[in-house]
């Protein structure tokens, strides 16, 4: 057995006055009671051997970055091995109570204890309002205090075994989780355990991380014996948990402290990057009831992304593990190119739900747990050895000193340094006096709109010129400019109700306007296109003199013919073949490119003009003809067909 389970005596436990030790303090008091065996600290954890089946069990004992293990893994015996031989134990559970537990009660229990113990710093402010449930004392009253309400009678052991005998392991796991979420009067989830393989040394880090969250949940939410200092103690534990999530493993510049605090308050809020929250209700609610939790609230765990840790910490882990393997096996037995986090990090995704998660080697797991397991350091002695609490406490004190010195100035930094050096100093005052760090700016995402000041600046820079300068550049007369400026000012006025017609009102259409309309109608709004993508705009030609249209001899050239409807000199340019070229030449000149309908329109207009010009010759009074309205005469004048009607 390469990785056995260690034991620790209660007389070697040295706790501090830190509120993070309140859970371990309450458990130690329960263990030291002379009427509540066992007296050993680790004996109350109920360590047992278990076997779990997994398809990747062979990768634990025969990793690909160790040459000797890789060669041994090619045998039939290693290939058939799919069982994980593990040690497993649970943390002692804590049940919330409503009655107050005073300092005198616990001191009297310790005074009657025959087991020697060190200073536990028992004060009302350090006593959690709860009772420890020891595995060996299921039928006895806990030592902390008795609850005011009697507990409901639980099912007997025989009936419970008969009820769960027909269920699979995953069904039992889900049933235990549902039972814990519905009742939820206990702190530790029974499904969370400390598990490690005693053959390969791989540790189930997901279980330790969730047990840490269960304990921190109680330290943050449960009140203390002293109601005055309860809020301060809870605030200190909450700040410590926020610091672990923000600064301990991840890059603290990736998100602000406000975001990490939002995760502590509610799981419905958006979580910071590199951190995912599992399904469940509020994880850390400062206003949660100390005695019981609503049935709708379940344990909510923040998953730890081991691949997203800081690059400096990742390099430290790889180098430390490489040095350990070289010292243990020698450099010839290690395949250095394959020694990377992707290879020594194992993940179980299927099978038994209880062991699904991240598994890491013992050396790496111990290095990571040193950074956050200060509140549970003595509960990890069976897996990491008796030296782990001292190393974890040293790292915590050094880390607290660095953190406080960087976030405080003057007397605050000196007070924090003194508190970090002396374990008997009260840490709560330092945490309360510590100012809140200034939130760091986050990079703006693409979906984020620009700020109001920046948008206003862009609008000012891209503003249009004034209306007066625009009117000056139109090239209008002075009367028109004055009218436009006057009209625009009247439109801006709130008392303006009537509109005045502009002197530049619409006039009768000219021949050019009518020609453009006819061309637009015939072409359906499209321009003519020719081979080689050559565009030839419709050219404007002056109409032939009216005397040519009125001459009978020249009208023969304009006689409508179905075979040749348009004279040759007025044919459409689409009858011409224009050669295509990669470089389009200048458009050739074509004679009067009018269409067929356009030609008939002009012919009709000339006939109307001829009739109107010949009618005064049959009247005695040529200039007194009133058969035509001024509107009609004005339209004929706009056609510009008027000539000398001397025929």
Curated annotation (Swiss-Prot):
Polar residues bias locations? 138-148, 156-170
Tell me where in this chain the HTH APSES-type domain is found. Answer: 282-395
Ranges annotated as DNA-binding: 318-339
Biological process (GO) annotations held by this record are:
cellular response to glucose starvation; cellular response to heat; cellular response to nitrogen starvation; cellular response to osmotic stress; G1 to G0 transition; meiotic cell cycle; negative regulation of transcription by RNA polymerase II; positive regulation of transcription by RNA polymerase II
Q: Where is the composition biased (Low complexity)?
A: 264-282, 425-434, 493-502
What subcellular locations does the record give? Nucleus
Q: Where does the protein principally reside? A: nucleus
Q: Which GO terms describe its molecular function?
A: DNA-binding transcription activator activity, RNA polymerase II-specific; DNA-binding transcription factor activity; DNA-binding transcription factor activity, RNA polymerase II-specific; sequence-specific DNA binding
Residue ranges of coiled coil: none
Q: Kindly state which keywords UniProt assigns to this record, in alphabetical order.
A: DNA-binding, Nucleus, Repressor, Stress response, Transcription, Transcription regulation
Q: Where is the composition biased (Basic residues)?
A: 435-445
Q: Where is this region: Disordered?
A: 138-170, 264-295, 425-455, 485-508, 612-647
Q: According to its UniProt entry, what is the function of this protein?
A: Transcriptional repressor which binds to the consensus sequence 5'-GCCTCGA[G/A]G[C/A]-3'. Represses CLN1 transcription.
Q: Anything else of interest in the record?
A: Present with 195 molecules/cell in log phase SD medium.
- Protein name listed in UniProt: Transcriptional repressor XBP1
Which organism's genome codes for this protein?
Answer: Saccharomyces cerevisiae (strain ATCC 204508 / S288c)
Gene that specifies this protein = XBP1
């Amino acid at each position: 057995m390469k990785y056995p389970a260690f034991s620790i005596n209660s007389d070697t436990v040295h706790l501090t006055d830190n509120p993070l030790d309140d859970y371990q303090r309450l458990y130690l008091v329960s263990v030291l009671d002379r009427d509540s065996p066992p007296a050993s600290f680790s004996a109350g954890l109920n360590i047992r051997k278990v076997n779990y089946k997994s398809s990747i069990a062979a990768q634990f004992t025969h990793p690909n970055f160790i040459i000797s293990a890789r060669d041994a893994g090619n045998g039939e015996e290693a290939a058939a091995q799919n069982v994980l031989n593990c040690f497993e134990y649970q943390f002692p559970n804590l049940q919330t109570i409503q009655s107050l537990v005073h300092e005198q009660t616990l001191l009297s229990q310790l005074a009657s204890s025959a087991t020697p113990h060190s200073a536990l710093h028992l004060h009302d402010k350090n006593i959690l309002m709860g009772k420890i449930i020891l595995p060996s004392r299921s039928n006895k009253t806990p030592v902390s205090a008795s609850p005011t309400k009697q507990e409901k009678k639980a099912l007997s052991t025989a009936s419970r075994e008969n009820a769960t005998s027909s269920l699979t392991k995953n069904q039992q796991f889900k049933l235990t989780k549902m039972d814990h979420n519905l009742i939820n009067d206990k702190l530790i989830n029974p499904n969370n355990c400390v598990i490690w393989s005693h053959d390969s040394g791989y540790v189930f880090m997901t279980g330790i991380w969730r047990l840490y969250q269960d304990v921190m949940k109680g330290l943050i939410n449960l009140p203390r014996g002293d109601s005055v200092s309860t809020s301060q103690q809870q605030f200190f534990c909450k700040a410590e948990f926020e610091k672990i999530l923000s600064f301990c493993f991840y890059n603290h510049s990736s998100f602000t402290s406000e975001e990490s605090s939002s995760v502590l308050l509610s799981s419905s809020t958006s979580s910071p990057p590199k951190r995912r929250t599992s399904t469940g209700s509020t994880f850390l609610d400062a206003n949660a009831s100390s005695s019981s939790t609503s049935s709708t609230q379940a344990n909510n765990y923040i998953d730890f992304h081991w691949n997203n840790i800081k690059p400096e910490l990742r390099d430290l882990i790889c180098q430390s593990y490489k040095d350990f393997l070289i010292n243990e096996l020698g450099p010839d037995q290690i395949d250095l190119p394959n020694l990377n986090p992707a290879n020594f990090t194992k993940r179980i995704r299927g099978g038994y739900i209880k062991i699904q998660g991240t598994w890491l080697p013992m050396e790496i797991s111990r290095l990571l747990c040193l950074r956050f397991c200060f509140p549970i350091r003595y509960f990890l002695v069976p897996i990491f050895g008796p030296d782990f609490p001292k190393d974890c406490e040293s790292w915590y004190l050094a880390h607290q000193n660095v953190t406080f010195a960087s976030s405080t100035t003057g007397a605050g930094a000196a007070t924090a340094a003194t508190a970090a050096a002396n374990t008997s100093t009260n840490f709560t005052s330092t945490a309360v006096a510590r100012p809140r760090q200034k939130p760091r700016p986050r990079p703006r995402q693409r979906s984020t709109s620009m700020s109001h000041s920046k948008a206003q600046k862009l609008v000012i820079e891209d503003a249009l010129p004034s209306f007066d300068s625009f009117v000056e550049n139109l090239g209008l007369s002075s009367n028109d400019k004055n009218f436009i400026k006057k009209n625009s000012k009247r439109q801006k006025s709130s008392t303006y109700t009537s509109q005045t017609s502009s002197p530049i009102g619409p006039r009768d259409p000219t021949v050019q306007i009518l020609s453009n309309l006819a061309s637009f109608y015939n072409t359906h709004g499209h321009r003519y296109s020719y081979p080689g993508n050559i565009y030839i705009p419709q050219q404007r030609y002056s109409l032939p003199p009216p005397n040519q249209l009125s001459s009978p001899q020249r009208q023969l050239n304009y006689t409508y013919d179905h075979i040749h409807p348009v004279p040759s000199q007025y044919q459409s340019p689409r009858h011409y073949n224009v050669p295509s070229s990669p470089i389009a030449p200048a458009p050739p000149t074509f004679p009067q490119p009018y269409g067929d309908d356009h030609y008939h329109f002009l012919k009709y207009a000339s006939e109307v003009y001829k009739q109107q010009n010949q009618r005064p010759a049959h009247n005695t009074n040529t200039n007194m003809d009133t058969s035509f309205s001024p509107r009609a005469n004005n339209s004929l004048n706009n056609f510009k067909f008027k000539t000398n009607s001397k025929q």
